[in-house]
Amino acid sequence: MDHAARPGRFFGVYLLYCQNPRHRGRVYVGFTVNPARRVRQHNAGRKKGGAWRTSGRGPWDMVLIIHGFPSAVAALRFEWAWQHPQASRRLTHVGPRLRSEAAFAFHLRVLAHMLRVPPWVRLPLTLRWLRPDFRHELCPAPPAHMPIAFGPPPPQPLVPKRPAVSEADSERQLDLGTKARCSLCARLLQDEEGPLCCPHPGCPLRAHIICLAEEFLQEEPGQLLPLEGHCPSCKKSLLWGNLVGQCHADTEEEEDLELEEEHWTDLLET
């Protein structure tokens, strides 16, 4: 399945594993926009931006990260549910940690079920093992559209205020001006509506979110949220989460990226 990779911002939820002999086997779940920087902060201690629960207990290894969330809010909600499965109404079917069950194994068990229930089951997520020697098969396995990757995430470009466009695309946008119309319903597109554009080079598709959602859902009757579909113009495969994430990438402020620096749960010394 050939999906266009969208440039944009990185939102990940990671799993740390403690290598300190005194605390070996401890784990920690957190949110980050920069995995390499975040693990350095954890190992440097709370004064350097690490979390209270990890401070002074290193070294820590970031062994696994889930990324591909369409927004920081979506990633933070996933983080909270992974940290507190017993409090999430989505995970009432997941049993508590067994006495003989290691913390690492328990968190993988919870993760396996999270990836199989709404709303996460329909997100374009990637499960990435940063330490392949820690890899375990999840049961149940992730959905087919969620790839399993290994090694560090690919470098992320600096987030521009506006995406770079070719000269031809720029001229096309100028020609459209304020009279741009939806490729599907032919009604006018308003800037505040955030029209979706196909990311494949040269594709002219511009559509209302609701129009493209209805088009995609023709392939998935009975669903409320599209998972994927084929562009009505170029016929190439697209993931819905990538399209929506690309639409909103330019409207979010860079300051939101620092949500990872001081999580409110780090202040609860329990």
Swiss-Prot record:
Forms a heterodimer with SLX4. GO terms for biological process: DNA recombination; DNA repair; positive regulation of t-circle formation; t-circle formation. One of its GO terms (molecular function) is 5'-flap endonuclease activity. It comes from Mus musculus (Mouse). GO terms for cellular component: Slx1-Slx4 complex. Expressed in testis, colon, bone marrow, brain, thymus and to a lesser extent in heart, kidney, skeletal muscle and spleen. Its cofactor is a divalent metal cation. Its main location: nucleus. Keywords: DNA damage, DNA recombination, DNA repair, Endonuclease, Hydrolase, Metal-binding, Nuclease, Nucleus, Zinc, Zinc-finger. Catalytic subunit of the SLX1-SLX4 structure-specific endonuclease that resolves DNA secondary structures generated during DNA repair and recombination. Has endonuclease activity towards branched DNA substrates, introducing single-strand cuts in duplex DNA close to junctions with ss-DNA. Has a preference for 5'-flap structures, and promotes symmetrical cleavage of static and migrating Holliday junctions (HJs). Resolves HJs by generating two pairs of ligatable, nicked duplex products. It comes from the Eukaryota. Pfam families: GIY-YIG (PF01541), SLX1_C (PF21202). This is Structure-specific endonuclease subunit SLX1. A zinc finger (SLX1-type) spans 182-234. InterPro entries: GIY-YIG_endonuc, GIY-YIG_endonuc_sf, Slx1, SLX1_C, SLX1_endonuclease, Znf_RING/FYVE/PHD. Residues 9-94 form the GIY-YIG domain. It is an enzyme of class 3 (hydrolase). Its EC number is 3.1.-.-. It is found in: Nucleus. Belongs to the SLX1 family.
